[in-house]
Amino acid sequence: MTTKAEIEIEQTATGSTLTSRQRTISLVAIYAAVFTWGISYAGLMPLMALTLEGNGYSTLSIGIIGAVTPIGVILVAPFVPFIVSRLGTLNTIFLSSVGSLVMVALLPIFNTYNEWLALRFVAGVFGGMSWIISESWLNSIASEKMRNRITAMYGAVMATSFAVGPFMLTMIGVGDFWPYMVFAILIAFSLIPFALIGKMAPVLNLANDMKISGILIAMPSLLAAALVCGMVDMSMFSFLPIWGLRMGYEQEISIQLLSVFVLGNVVLQLPIAWLAEKTNGRLVLVLCGIVGIFGPIGVTLMADNLYAMGAVLFVWGGCIWALYTVSLAMLGERFKGGSLTAACAAFVVAYEISNIVGPPAAGYAIELWEPHGLMALMSASALLFTVLISARGIYRT
């Protein structure tokens, strides 16, 4: 849910003359920082949703809370170049990370609904800064021959942290104070790796003059893939635990369902990428769309069999995330240079917009048809995508 593709990086002596050992140390440090931050983010979402649910808030209200963070990310993105030029790479990382952990630590203190809206919005602003700079840093030190593997590992680390977050919540429990402190401390831990590699921080030139006009007409199917992935991703983070509760599962099991869903994101990306390389990326998108249609149906029908339902969640989660990763690879095949930057910018904007729209839509769907509205909406969104890409033809984008 980030704007890494919007970033053009000017390699400097700091980024381009690193030794192999320095490059490896920097990459490991970035992965470690992203991992701890991701755990906090992924654990906080179901924690807040379950807390609001327990306090009697509607699913629509919970969905709105989930939507304000991406709004903060989108709004801060144009200002990141100015902030980095004034403060520098490392200082901006520290400012944004400290701001994020403070916002999380304040959640149990200022705990009215409107206060949470404000805190989550500001957290999105700070978190967006950290995310953009982290991925810029990663790109600036990645060699061309290793870039795909480096960014693939980054995605796997992120997905793994998203799986660990909800599981950690089941270990510490849903409470009024300590869970928030644990997740705030994890954000603080993410600063340690950056501090260790501070002297190797690159000077980043982040372009903010992107042109994305005409991209929608050129690649509607790929943008639709980003929209569906973002909608399902954020909606499941916000509501899958609540869906589990309303289907009769205990709270711990309901939270772990989310970990199973995200675990599919981690494990299945390389096999699906291999399939796309050996066959056709567009065909794989169609197949993933079909899984997206029938996955929610299967989860609902198998709700009485925890293991069977978990297997469907696992495969469904992997295929939904593959809509993003396979489409992103297809962008690289079709667009180059400045055109690629514009295409990826549109792609990321589509993903973030769906992050904003998805949770409120999912919450409203649950209110209309409790508890099956969530799965019905997820299936319907995948159906629309599959019809679109099929209508345009497997060999077109």
What are these regions, as identified by a protein language model?
Residues 170, 184-204, 388-392:
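C-terminal membrane-cytosol helix-exit motif in multi-pass small-molecule transporters
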Residues 282-325:
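C-terminal transmembrane helical hairpin of 12-TM major facilitator-type secondary transporters
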